[in-house]
């Protein structure tokens, strides 16, 4: 195995082409001067838009800036032989209607469900020769209770009730994801007909209220309170509380003590895969295979997808209606509608002529909170990490915990808060929160034989360092070394196993994937930027102040994650408008 690692290191150094290109240039035919609809950006939401509109008979073209489709849902061979889900790395939130409507299995989508799904190893200094404890959670409730009982018998008894409580809340929120938010603009200043139509947008909200019933005040607290307050009402053991709290802060520049952090937790528990509520899994072939399946569904019905075609400007006619886009090379492409999968900031502050948008609207867009705590590190290793709390098997084959989200520096909610406080001072966390995943444990072809791809989703790292200092190569390497040192404490030998690494700080995530501030949700999933306030109040229904322009990415309702709901909802809104044009 070690010899294999040395050979791989030589290959990495010698490779002139470190990226696995999945080009879709001119998929669906050559560039035409006019389409019914143009989509800016081939992220998963943009591809979902194209697939739905094309199925509805709307001739659609997608223009992508990069050489590869998928936005943040991509597979790239950054290190020769190692195929990484370079940004997004897990699947759960994709709406079930999209699986079936777009026939994604028919178009090649294959999943690896994870069970167990969560592993939190302890360090427990002073344990002598004893193996440190760990917390392993999966779909077997009785086994979960045994695991939790190591830390608290009371928590073990309560855990099933907590899971049922959260499941009920997720069930109530679910209908809100698949429809445009309540149309407040129509209620306030629409015609009588518009006001009557807008009443239909109340149905999902009323349905949610019926499901929650008399428990509504308690559920309201979950959405508005700090997650520590919520978890303290249920549990006493820190390893369990900290493990659950990681889902409340992941991707968010917030502490577990921040009011409203409970919603982000809910956002990450309301998914499911293949009928299993709350299940998370790996896409076979990496996240890019999901984007490929959606693209295949779109192009099979006639959509056109173009890579390395950057949209420079949204075109507007003299009457204030969208009439297409201009590409970076000067090519004009006409269309009746334009749907933007890019962030609200890029869409409205860079691509759209400012004179056609209200000043107040532009000001609100410029004020969106896009702070990001995330640095993603993709690592190629020549063997599986062996954790002190769960040593490897003699032959090094994957064990159940290797398929999990492995939570490091997460034994106590205080550790999460301290990591956050460092970033508030402009410093990368001294002891970063780390979610370590090894997708090749279930999908071996992602790496050479005996080797593995490791995803390190870490926080907190500010966009700008203390004193206004920008990230440079030295700072990036120093932070990655710190993360590796942390992993080494839990899994000795990890650093020696490393073949290569790809470090993506917040500025890197912004530059490569167009994520403003490096924010994986396009803008924060805080209560003031959700539902009918996403991206801004009175413009949450995918339509924009400019007729014919729609927002269909993560900056629109219901927000970030590989969900596809924003794309699906926006496609239906645009289609209804097209029918009346």
Curated annotation (Swiss-Prot):
Q: Name one GO molecular function term.
A: oxidoreductase activity
State a GO cellular component annotated for this protein: mitochondrial matrix
- Residues engaged in binding FAD: 38-71
The record's function comment reads:
Probable oxidoreductase that may play a role as regulator of mitochondrial function.
Task: Give the UniProt family note.
Answer: Belongs to the carotenoid/retinoid oxidoreductase family.
Partners and quaternary state? Interacts with COX5B; this interaction may contribute to localize PYROXD2 to the inner face of the inner mitochondrial membrane.
Under which name does UniProt file this protein?
A: Pyridine nucleotide-disulfide oxidoreductase domain-containing protein 2
| Organism encoding this protein | Pongo abelii (Sumatran orangutan)
Taxonomic lineage from the root: Eukaryota, Metazoa, Chordata, Craniata, Vertebrata
Which gene codes for it?
Answer: PYROXD2
């Amino acid at each position: 195995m070690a010899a294999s690692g040395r050979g791989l290191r030589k290959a990495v150094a010698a490779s002139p082409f470190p990226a696995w290109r999945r080009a879709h240039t001119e998929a669906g035919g050559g560039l035409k001067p006019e389409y019914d609809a143009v989509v800016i950006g081939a992220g998963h939401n943009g591809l979902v838009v194209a697939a739905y509109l094309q199925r509805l008979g709307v001739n659609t073209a997608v223009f992508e800036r990069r050489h590869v489709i998928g936005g943040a849902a991509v597979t790239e061979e950054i290190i020769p032989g190692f195929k990484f889900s370079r940004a997004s790395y897990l699947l759960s939130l994709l709406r079930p209607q999209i699986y079936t409507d777009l026939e994604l299995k028919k178009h090649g989508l294959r999943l690896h469900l994870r069970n167990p799904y969560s592993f939190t190893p302890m360090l427990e200094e002073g344990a002598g020769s004893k193996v440190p404890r760990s917390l392993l959670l999966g779909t077997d409730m009785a086994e979960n209770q045994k695991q939790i009982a190591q830390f608290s018998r009371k928590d073990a008894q309560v855990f099933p009730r907590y899971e049922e409580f959260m499941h009920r809340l997720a069930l109530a929120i679910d209908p809100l994801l698949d429809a445009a938010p309540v149309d407040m603009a129509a209620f306030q200043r629409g015609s009588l007909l518009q006001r009557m139509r807008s009443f239909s947008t109340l149905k999902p909200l009323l349905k949610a209220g019926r499901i929650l019933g008399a428990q509504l005040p308690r559920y309201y607290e979950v959405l508005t309170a700090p997650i520590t307050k919520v978890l303290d009402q249920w549990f006493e053991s820190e390893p369990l509380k900290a493990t659950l709290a990681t889902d409340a802060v992941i991707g968010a520049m917030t502490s577990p003590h921040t009011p409203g952090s409970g919603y982000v937790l809910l956002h990450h528990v309301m998914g499911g895969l293949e009928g299993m509520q709350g299940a998370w899994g790996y896409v076979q072939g990496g996240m890019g295979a999901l984007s490929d399946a959606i693209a295949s569904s779109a192009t099979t019905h006639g959509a056109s997808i173009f890579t390395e075609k950057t949209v420079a400007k949204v075109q507007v006619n003299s009457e204030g209606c969208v009439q297409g886009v201009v590409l970076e090379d000067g090519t004009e492409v006409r269309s009746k509608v334009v749907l933007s999968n890019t962030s609200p900031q890029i869409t409205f502050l860079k691509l759209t002529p400012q004179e056609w948008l209200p000043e107040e609207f532009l000001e609100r867009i410029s004020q969106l909170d896009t702070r990001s705590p995330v640095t993603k590190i993709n690592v190629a290793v020549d063997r599986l990490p062996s954790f002190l709390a769960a040593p490897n098997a003699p032959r090094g084959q994957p064990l159940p915990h290797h398929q999990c989200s492995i939570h490091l520096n997460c034994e106590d909610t205080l550790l999460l808060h301290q990591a956050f406080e460092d970033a508030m001072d402009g410093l990368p966390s001294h002891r970063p929160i780390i979610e370590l995943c090894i997708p090749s444990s279930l999908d071996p072809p992602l790496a050479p034989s005996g080797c593995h791809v490791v995803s390190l989703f870490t926080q907190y790292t500010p966009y700008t360092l203390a004193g206004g200092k920008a990230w440079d190569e030295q700072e990036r390497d120093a932070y990655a070394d710190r993360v590796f040192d942390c992993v080494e404490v839990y899994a000795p030998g990890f650093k020696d196993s490393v073949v290569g690494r790809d470090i993506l700080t917040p500025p890197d995530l912004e530059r490569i994937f167009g994520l403003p501030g490096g924010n994986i949700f396009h803008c924060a999933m805080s209560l003031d930027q959700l539902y009918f306030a996403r991206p801004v109040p009175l413009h949450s229904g995918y339509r924009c102040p400019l007729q014919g322009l729609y927002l269909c990415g993560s900056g629109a309702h219901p927000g970030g994650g590989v969900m596809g709901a924003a794309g699906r909802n926006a496609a239906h809104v645009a289609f209804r408008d097209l029918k009346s044009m």
